[in-house]
Design a protein with these regions (language model features):
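Mature catalytic core of soluble alpha/beta enzymes
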Residues: 2-8, 17-316
């Protein structure tokens, strides 16, 4: 279950905002089944806020038309029903990135695992569990590449695309929140951007209400994504089934990793790796993170916590 990190807003930050002479602008709207929020330092930017707002909306609409599984007219949806398509830049980018992270994760990240999610159902609302035969058929469909599903990387990638545009018009300080987060530079108080990391316990259904800590950026370009199982699960005959499906086995994971917060140079990378970590479990996730340059993580398991050396967490 991919959960949205929230933009940590403290009274001191709001006061700092009021002292900047209006240099920071916030843009918000609806995209990809939720809301987005983009905060930028307008110093040195010649574009008007109205122009930036329109450009962000246009970019997100273009991404939706390309890779959304919920838009029946998107390139992705048309491809999944057998129609021949001409991939655009977004579609091609995600195919390339997805292949990269599938290989890096040993198959723990796989955008062709859509048949498995269809089989198990979002949130596991079915009264009966899939049979072994049904799982094998779904795995065969995954191997054949019948259905693509970019959900595990699309929001992170969207953050990167919006950030790319902001860089092009001279923005240096930004926070892009489209379900996942990309940030660079400083917040209005002159510090690194602060992102709350939720405590992964049953019953914590409101992001930001129960925090494990606050992650603070180092002032550079960083994507940050949390993936977790504690809000989405199904109990059948006394057994708890996690929302995360292992695309290699076709079944829900059974390890003790509750959440994985990953920081990477891009939000797309953080998005894909957070998903892979939740499939791999505590040890596999740690090994994956330690093998990659520029990647940090905060892993919370049922029996402990692991923090990579460069993960900047301020405990609550």
């Amino acid at each position: 279950m991919k959960r949205k990190l929230f933009f940590f807003t403290a009274l001191t930050l709001m006061l700092a905002c009021s002292c900047t002479g209006g240099r920071y602008e916030t843009f918000s709207g609806y995209a990809q089944g939720g809301t987005y929020r983009v905060k930028v330092n307008m110093q040195g930017v010649k574009c008007s806020p109205e122009t930036i707002a329109a450009a962000i909306d246009s970019l997100l609409e273009g991404i939706d038309f390309s890779i959304s599984g919920y838009n029946r007219n998107s390139l992705l949806s048309r491809r999944n029903v057998g129609e021949e398509i001409v991939p655009d830049r977004y579609f091609s980018d995600l195919l390339e990135l997805s292949a990269k992270y599938k290989e890096l994760s040993g198959g723990a990240f796989d955008v062709y695992s859509g048949p498995l999610f269809d089989l198990w159902g979002f949130g596991f609302t079915s009264d009966s569990l899939p049979s072994d035969e049904a799982i094998e058929r779904a795995l065969a469909d995954c191997k054949a590449g019948k259905v693509l599903n970019f959900n595990a990387i699309a929001q992170g990638y969207s953050c990167d695309i919006v950030a790319e545009y902001l860089y092009s018009i001279g923005v240096k300080d930004m926070l892009v929140d489209i379900g996942e987060i990309f940030c660079d530079g400083r917040n209005p108080s002159g510090k690194g951007w602060s992102i709350g990391v939720d405590n992964p316990v049953d019953g914590n259904d409101s992001p930001g209400s129960d925090l494990r800590g606050i992650w603070r950026s180092n002032g550079g370009a960083q994507g940050v994504v949390t993936s977790g199982n504690y809000r989405k699960f199904y109990i059948k005959d006394g057994k708890k089934y996690a929302h995360t499906i292992d695309p290699r086995s076709g079944r829900p994971v059974e390890h003790g990793l509750l959440s994985a917060t990953v920081v990477a140079p891009t939000a797309a990378e953080a998005d894909a790796l957070a998903t892979a970590c939740m499939v791999l479990g505590p040890q596999g996730a740690r090994e994956l993170v330690e093998s990659l340059d520029g990647v940090e993580a905060y892993l919370i398991s049922s029996d402990g916590v692991w923090t990579s050396g460069g993960f900047n967490l301020e405990q609550q």
